[in-house]
Amino acid sequence: GCCHPSTCHVRKGCSRCCS
């Protein structure tokens, strides 16, 4: 799934950032 832009670079479980 996608992660919030603020935590995208921090969370390893996300495949991409949410726009």
From Swiss-Prot:
It is found in: Secreted. Expressed by the venom duct. Keywords: Disulfide bond, Secreted, Toxin. Coiled coil: none annotated. Contains 3 disulfide bonds. The cysteine framework is III (CC-C-C-CC). Belongs to the conotoxin M superfamily. This is Conotoxin 5.
